[in-house]
Amino acid sequence: MNVHEYQAKQIFAEYGVPTPKGIMAESVDAAVEAAKELGGPIWVVKAQIHAGGRGLGGGVKLAKSLDEVRELADEILGMTLVTHQTGPEGKLVQKLYIEDGADIKDEFYLSVILDRKLEMPLIMASTEGGMNIEDVAENTPEKIITVPVDPTIGFQGFHGRELAFGLGITDKAEQKNIITFAQKLYKLYMDKDAEMIEINPLVRTGSGEFLALDGKMGFDNSALYRQPEIAAMRDLSEEDPDEVEAAKYGLSYVALDGEIGCMVNGAGLAMGTMDTINHMGGTPANFLDVGGSANAETVAKGFEIILKNPNVKAIFVNIFGGIVRCDRIANGIIEATKITDVHVPVIVRLDGTNAPEAAEILKNANISNLIVAEDLGDGAAKAVAAAKGEI
């Protein structure tokens, strides 16, 4: 789960992570009132969407008067902001963050993420603040500093010193400031079950202080039950409506840009299914994991969500029946076709408990667009052929 910048900075404040003062606004008048309350004389008007690259997209602008605040708020609020992370469709700006201007001497990049290879949190930093970190990693990887932190000992002084030296911070007082800053950020990361904290840019002021000029946070969905105050920050309007709808039925759905809809139980099998479709010359239209609940209702909802995509020309159902028997899944698929109008070929591969009986049930159902596959390769090949109109 992601949160807006203004929400991330509220959490930063709880842990004493310094940020400029700011106020969220949902209207032009509220933006002007926020600027008055902050006092100025310089403000930054920021679009609030769940995506990076807002500045380059025209969603972050400087105002030097209240009239400019009004003008920029009117321009940004309600716009569809397109960035390298939103895709060409962009995101509608419904909230603004009005923030005090800052005295910027230098800009850095700082983040805390989970390194899955090292199996521990990783502090990542760079002197190239304000830039797309992916571009820095590709073009000048030597400018990225990585400091792994073993969670059994936590963030220690030597971690902070390694970070400070790597960023070229030599002044003793400034070294102390950046170490304290990183220490607070790491504690926040651990306490709140965060998956990612990113500050870009982290700025050094003329007085040697460090401020989080931006703030992005992502959280582990599986841990939200013990972070109710974080869960309450969820903004469903920023999420894909089909993904939200799928989650209500216990389905994990991610839209892709192919032509073959996929319905699979288990994330690993789902990824393997998509790889096999690609190997056979097709392109998956989605990732859809029905988990262990492949009954008529969930399968019908899965069909409904998949078929919202007008590009889908075939559906490949690939289920391994372990706890749930294949014959029950087969009956569920047949019932689902009665609930939802499935107007494209559906290729079904079932394996596991009672798989032979399931195949007979499907064949005897006499549903013209239901095709039974022998195995994964056969199913993927038939799905690709069906999408091309060859079967």
Swiss-Prot record:
Its cofactor is Mg(2+). It comes from the Bacteria. Substrate binds at residues 265, 322-324. Pathway: Carbohydrate metabolism; tricarboxylic acid cycle; succinate from succinyl-CoA (ligase route): step 1/1. The keyword ATP-binding applies. Binds 1 Mg(2+) ion per subunit. It catalyses: succinate + ATP + CoA = succinyl-CoA + ADP + phosphate; GTP + succinate + CoA = succinyl-CoA + GDP + phosphate. ATP binds at residues 46, 53-55, 99, 102, 107. Keywords: ATP-binding, Ligase, Magnesium, Metal-binding, Nucleotide-binding, Tricarboxylic acid cycle. Mg(2+) binds at residues 200, 214. GO terms for cellular component: cytosol; succinate-CoA ligase complex. InterPro entries: ATP-grasp, ATP-grasp_succ-CoA_synth-type, ATP_grasp_subdomain_1, Succ-CoA_synthase_bsu_CS, SUCC_ACL_C, Succ_CoA_ligase-like_bsu, Succinyl-CoA_synth-like. Its EC number is 6.2.1.5. Heterotetramer of two alpha and two beta subunits. This is Succinate--CoA ligase [ADP-forming] subunit beta.
